Curated annotation (Swiss-Prot):
It comes from Parasynechococcus marenigrum (strain WH8102). It comes from the Bacteria. Part of the 50S ribosomal subunit. This is Large ribosomal subunit protein uL6. GO terms for molecular function: rRNA binding; structural constituent of ribosome. One of its GO terms (cellular component) is cytosolic large ribosomal subunit. PANTHER family: 60S/50S RIBOSOMAL PROTEIN L6/L9 (PTHR11655), LARGE RIBOSOMAL SUBUNIT PROTEIN UL6M (PTHR11655:SF14).
């Protein structure tokens, strides 16, 4: 049995959860999320807790047990507190700004790169070099942050590019040259 999956998910007072078969709807102060869980698990509500259990003892059911529990926990955390990911832009002349809702990144290309956020995601820029991606869906926040980083991933020689806050870049030595 999954060590993560067997723990019940506590539901805060400000959050309401409704179950319809394998569809879980979570509503909280930050918004509302809905997700259909894969087959092989059963979801039930006891008091102020959500319990996820494998519906059969087959392997695919046991594999999805911990995953589904974590997905439900992430939904509850997202509508209650939200998620955010910070990125740093390193390099001379590289900067970002928000125009309306669109993120505009100047990262050393001949043109600025524009990113339109999907529904539920907001971009915020501090000091022209720090981008904060925030929203209530953890998966969507992570995907959008990865797309921003992919505009100009950090290079190993000088460390220039877009990196996650706190990310350590493995540095390489340059050519030593002829003597």
């Amino acid at each position: 049995m999954s060590r993560i999956g067997k723990n019940p998910v506590p539901v805060p007072d400000k959050v309401t959860v409704s179950l319809d078969g394998l569809t879980v709807k979570v509503k909280g102060p930050k918004g509302e999320l809905e997700r259909t869980l894969p087959d092989g698990v059963s979801v039930s509500q006891d008091n102020n807790c959500i319990v996820v259990a494998p519906s059969t003892s087959k392997r695919f059911s046991r594999e999805r047990h911990g995953l589904c529990r974590t997905l439900v926990a992430n939904m509850i955390e997202g509508v209650n507190n939200g998620y955010s990911k910070s990125l740093e832009i390193v390099g001379v002349g590289s900067r970002a700004q928000v125009k309306g809702k669109t993120l505009v990144v100047s990262a050393g290309y001949s043109h600025p790169v524009e990113m339109e956020p999907p529904e539920g995601i907001t971009f915020k820029v501090e000091n022209n070099t720090k981008v904060i991606v925030s929203g209530i869906d953890k998966e969507l926040v992570g995907n959008e942050a990865a797309k921003v980083r992919a505009i100009r991933p950090p290079e190993p020689y000088k460390g220039k590019g877009i990196k996650y806050e706190g990310e350590r870049i493995m540095r390489k030595a340059g050519k030593s040259g002829k003597k």
